[in-house]
């Protein structure tokens, strides 16, 4: 019963990036499921192709970061700065992103199905939304309920 040694070892290896500066950091193609970047600064960081399922980005600053093709599903992204980020082909299914800024973000092919976004953000994203997510086959405009 309880947590196995292997599970404990995996948990101990998980890195917590809360309140750290990861600007220009290289996280591409990494397995970062459930990792916390809460309050972190990740301006210009490379998260392309990373598995960030269930990650926490609350109150973080990720302007101009690259999330191209990343899995951000079920992530907490509330009150965070995603200004001018590359979210092309990203999975944002079920994210909670209330109070966040996506101004100037490239969302071509991103899947926002069941995402919680501020109404103003949703309207702005709909103005530039295009493409179809290559993994889910869902059109970005449809996922945003445009």
Predicted regions: what they are:
Residues 2-145:
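Tandem repeat scaffolds
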């Amino acid at each position: 019963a309880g947590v196995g040694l292997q599970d404990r070892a995996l948990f101990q290896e998980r890195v917590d990036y809360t309140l750290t500066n990861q600007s220009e950091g290289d996280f591409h193609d990494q397995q970062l499921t459930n990792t916390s970047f809460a309050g972190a600064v990740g301006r210009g960081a490379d998260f392309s192709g990373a598995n960030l399922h269930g990650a926490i980005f609350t109150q973080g600053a990720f302007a101009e970061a690259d999330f191209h093709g990343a899995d951000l599903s079920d992530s907490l992204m509330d009150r965070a700065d995603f200004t001018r980020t590359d979210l092309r082909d990203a999975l944002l299914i079920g994210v909670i992103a209330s109070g966040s800024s996506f101004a100037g973000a490239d969302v071509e092919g991103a899947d926002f199905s069941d995402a919680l976004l501020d109404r103003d953000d949703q309207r702005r994203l709909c103005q530039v939304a295009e493409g179809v997510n290559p993994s889910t086959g869902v059109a970005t405009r449809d996922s945003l309920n445009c």
